[in-house]
């Protein structure tokens, strides 16, 4: 079936669903609607995200969506990730408050499901520092104060020619308040329908405009409480599938210990006395795991300008963010790395007799235990992020504008993991007959205390950017004036990760990990042109060409160029066609280049040896080169003159990424780099050069398995946006429909085998619904407004059941619709009350075979259920 047929089918299905359920979508409008409103007020030249050329028309060859502050407030969001992750163009694995296992308290945006490191985040058009824990490689959205946001522009197109690395899936440009006069105070609180996950926020903004400039100061404090998996029916226990259906399962590493004897004994020590192990002895690890994670956050920000002369202005921006976040998981499961010999006292040994008669004297046993005596595993992060921008901008007599700026960012983090146990030391104590593992009291109090430790890791990153830019009109052509922009940037990035000392020495439970430390710098220069080709011809009212090229020279891999071409064709006043072709790239990050090494033993099969394990060292790879992308977009913008306030945009995108940075199967490296006789082959390839493969006289193969440029990802689809503003019943109305249709999403492994994710939900990689749509409707009176919103997510098949759905109890999930309502009322000219309810119908997330966490997918679905929020604002 053709792509167009699939698209038409998906559109029909989505619109029928919306009509049947009165669905609504997010408050996202295309650039055309915003442009019409702006033109009604005044005509000015502005730089739209995706171009550095200032222009009067917001519609360019690339699709840009705009989210304004009112839409953010209406959603009840206290962090911008709450809004961005609900966009239909967002997808994949999006880290948020509902991700307990491995989130590190971070919040990311993931356009097109291509990964947060392929979405560039800007603040006021300038690169934001990568932030979070470790040697972070993407932006933690917690660092951007939502109360300071004026609007967010989302470019859904590649833009490396304009902005450089990372702009493959698109660009999120957060525009902060700059011209603000007066004082504003906001207080907001919210809570779930279950009485948990409470969240409170207080912020103030004050600003003043004076003769030569202005200054704006903002502070925001947010505190979010937790919710437990034990407090929701769908997540109160880990669900397993049996012949008779679903049942509550659990871990065989149980409370009181689990013993497997060499002669078939299977014992549980739950309750303090050993007995035959049954399913009732399995440990419910959901009961002590967070469903939604707690956090505290402080954001301070400032922006100011000062006129140095009639044509030169000094500007500055400063942001500081401090985050305290926590996650909680079940007590640690531990096990013996080598079997223990049972030596009971009754047979002249030194161990308890409690295992008799199930285990014989001298019998080898394996042991596992859930360490409930020590408490849950508590993950905590403290993250400090600073961003400072200073610069000057001006205008020449000919109207050309220029600016010079310095952008400094710094991120530091400390993350801890409490209530861990050093099983290596416990094993040593058992062998020395100093610790009886079968005696329950050995695992309690002072006896176990010497083996309990807290892991403490540190990490951080630093960013320095010096930039110069120039833009203006260069020549009048028959069809209009040619505009240009040019600039130079120098950027240096560094990052580090210092693991806990026990981990670094290989004395902890996890494999030894070396520290990460490194840096790189890059010199970049770019030129951009906006060339009017044709004007004032029937059916060719205006045709414009845009072109951009960027040269970059990295200290790590060398130099190259990236480019972009775009065309806009205004057929007549109502209709504009647009398209673009570009290349984009993502340079390897510090952690990918210089990530600390860690040894492991991997299973391999190779004709040069009888050994089945290879000594493999994983980590970064300093020989990495950039990921490369080819991007095509085609679209139309239609604003019919016979329907005032109506605007439609339809855009097609196709993104092909090659040279993707990914891990490689160890068998693949061994077979690519050694022949059947153990001789090195393919030594000229990047893969084998980086592997440093060797085989010794015993047949032991050893090599480095660092990250490689060996993968490929392709995705394509359609974005449809319909916006309508009108008057009726004495009210002002605004309606919006935002739809994304996924046509393809494929990833290719090192052998060129394609893995198709379209229409599938995975166990942590992401969810790739074929059809997603958001709708919203706002009615506004003189002193009030009310908004209805809804999100539709198409049904998906479980990726775990792809080969044989009949083997799965829940091989798919049904489509789901979330309904939200909000309203505000102006009590006086200075006081406003607002509030709302998200997930009004209290929809539960779906269960599916092969789920990620909480028996569902917290990256995609709302796990809290119905949520209430209220807000009071004072402004004067």
Task: State where each predicted segment sits.
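N-terminal periplasmic accessory domains that precede
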Residues: 80-83, 87, 107-110, 140-142, ...
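C-terminal beta-signal and adjacent terminal beta-strands/loops
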Residues: 656-658, 743, 791-802, 824-876
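C-terminal beta-signal and terminal closure region of outer-membrane beta-barrel proteins
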Residues: 415-418, 422-425, 582, 599, ...
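Short acidic/polar hinge/loop motifs at secondary-structure boundaries
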Residues: 127-156
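Surface-exposed, low-complexity loop segments enriched in small/polar and acidic residues
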Residues: 227-240, 264-295, 301, 310-522, ...
């Amino acid at each position: 079936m053709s792509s167009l047929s699939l698209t038409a089918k998906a559109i029909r299905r989505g619109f029928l669903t919306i009509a049947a359920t009165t669905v609504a979508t997010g408050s996202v409008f295309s650039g055309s609607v915003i442009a019409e409103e702006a033109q009604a007020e005044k005509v000015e030249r502005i730089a739209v995200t995706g171009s550095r050329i200032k222009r009067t028309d917001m519609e360019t060859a690339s699709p840009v969506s705009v989210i304004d502050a009112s839409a953010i407030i209406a959603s009840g969001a206290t962090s911008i990730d709450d809004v961005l992750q609900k966009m239909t163009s967002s997808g994949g694995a999006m880290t948020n408050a509902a991700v307990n296992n491995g989130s590190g308290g971070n919040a990311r945006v993931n356009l097109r499901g291509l990964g947060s490191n392929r979405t560039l985040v800007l603040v006021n058009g300038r690169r934001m520092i990568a932030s979070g824990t470790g040697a972070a490689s993407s932006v933690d959205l917690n660092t951007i104060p939502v109360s300071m946001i004026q609007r967010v522009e989302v470019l859904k197109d590649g833009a490396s020619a304009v902005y450089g690395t990372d702009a493959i899936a698109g660009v999120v440009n957060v525009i902060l308040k700059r011209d603000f006069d007066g004082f504003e105070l906001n207080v907001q609180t919210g809570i779930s329908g279950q009485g948990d996950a409470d969240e409170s926020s207080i912020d103030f903004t004050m600003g003043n405009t004076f003769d030569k400039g202005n200054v704006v100061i903002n502070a925001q404090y947010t505190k979010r409480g937790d919710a437990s998996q034990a407090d929701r029916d769908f997540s109160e226990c880990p669900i397993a599938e049996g012949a008779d259906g679903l049942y509550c399962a659990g871990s065989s590493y149980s409370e009181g210990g689990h013993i497997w004897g060499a002669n078939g004994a299977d014992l549980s020590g739950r309750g303090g006395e050993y007995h035959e192990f049954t399913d009732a002895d399995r440990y419910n690890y959901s009961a002590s795991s967070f469903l939604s994670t707690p956090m505290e956050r402080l954001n301070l920000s400032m922006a100011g300008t000062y006129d140095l002369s009639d044509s030169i202005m000094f500007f500055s921006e400063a942001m500081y963010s401090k985050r305290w976040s926590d996650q909680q998981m079940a007590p640690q499961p531990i096990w013996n790395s080598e079997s223990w010999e049972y030596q009971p006292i009754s047979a002249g040994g030194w161990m308890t007799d409690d295992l008799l008669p199930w285990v014989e004297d001298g019998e080898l046993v394996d042991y596992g235990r859930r360490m409930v005596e020590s408490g849950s595993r508590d993950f905590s992060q403290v993250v400090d992020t600073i961003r400072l921008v200073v610069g000057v901008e001006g205008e020449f007599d000919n109207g050309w504008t220029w600016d010079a700026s310095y952008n400094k960012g710094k991120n530091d983090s400390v993350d801890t993991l409490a209530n861990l146990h050093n099983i290596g030391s416990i094993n040593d104590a058992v062998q020395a007959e100093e610790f009886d593992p079968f005696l329950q009291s050995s695992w309690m109090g002072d006896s176990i205390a010497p083996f309990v430790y807290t892991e403490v890791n540190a990490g951080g990153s630093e960013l320095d950017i010096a930039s110069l830019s120039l833009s203006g009109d260069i020549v009048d052509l028959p069809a209009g004036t040619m505009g240009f922009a040019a600039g130079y940037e120098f950027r240096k990035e560094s990052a580090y990760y210092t693991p806990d000392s026990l981990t670094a020495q290989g004395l902890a439970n996890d494999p030894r990990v070396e520290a990460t430390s490194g840096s790189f710098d890059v010199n970049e220069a770019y030129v951009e042109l906006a060339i009017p080709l044709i004007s004032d011809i029937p059916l060719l009212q205006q045709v414009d060409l845009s072109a951009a090229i960027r040269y970059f020279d990295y200290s790590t891999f060398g130099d190259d160029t990236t480019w972009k071409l775009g065309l806009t064709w205004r057929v007549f006043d109502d209709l504009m066609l647009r398209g673009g072709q570009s290349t984009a790239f993502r340079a390897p990050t510090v952690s990918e280049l210089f990530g600390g090494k860690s040894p492991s033993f991997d299973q391999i099969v190779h004709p040069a040896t009888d050994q089945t394990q290879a000594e493999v060292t994983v980590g970064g790879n300093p020989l990495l080169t950039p990921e490369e992308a080819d991007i095509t977009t085609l679209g139309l913008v239609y604003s019919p003159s016979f329907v005032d306030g109506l605007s439609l945009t339809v855009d097609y995108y196709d993104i092909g990424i090659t040279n993707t940075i990914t891990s490689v199967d160890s068998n693949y490296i061994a077979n690519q780099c050694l022949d059947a006789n153990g001789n090195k082959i393919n030594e000229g390839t990047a893969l084998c050069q980086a592997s440093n493969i060797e085989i010794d006289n015993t047949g032991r193969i050893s090599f480095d398995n660092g990250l490689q440029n060996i993968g490929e990802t392709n995705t394509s689809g359609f974005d449809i946006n319909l916006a309508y503003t009108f008057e009726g019943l004495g009210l002002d109305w605004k309606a919006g429909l935002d739809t994304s249709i996924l046509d393809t999403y494929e990833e290719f492994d090192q052998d060129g085998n394609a893995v198709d994710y379209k229409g599938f939900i995975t166990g942590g990689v992401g969810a790739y619904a074929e059809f997603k749509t958001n709708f919203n409707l706002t009615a506004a009176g003189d002193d009030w407004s009310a908004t209805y919103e809804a999100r539709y997510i198409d049904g998906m098949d479980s990726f775990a059941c792809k080969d044989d759905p009949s083997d799965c109890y829940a091989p798919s999930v049904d489509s789901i619709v979330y309904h939200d309502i909000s309203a505000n009322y102006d009590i006086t000219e200075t006081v406003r009350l607002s509030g709302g309810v998200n997930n009004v119908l209290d929809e539960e997330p779906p269960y599916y075979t092969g789920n990620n966490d909480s028996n569902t997918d917290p990256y995609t679905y709302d796990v809290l259920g119905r949520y209430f929020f209220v807000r009071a604002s004072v402004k004067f």
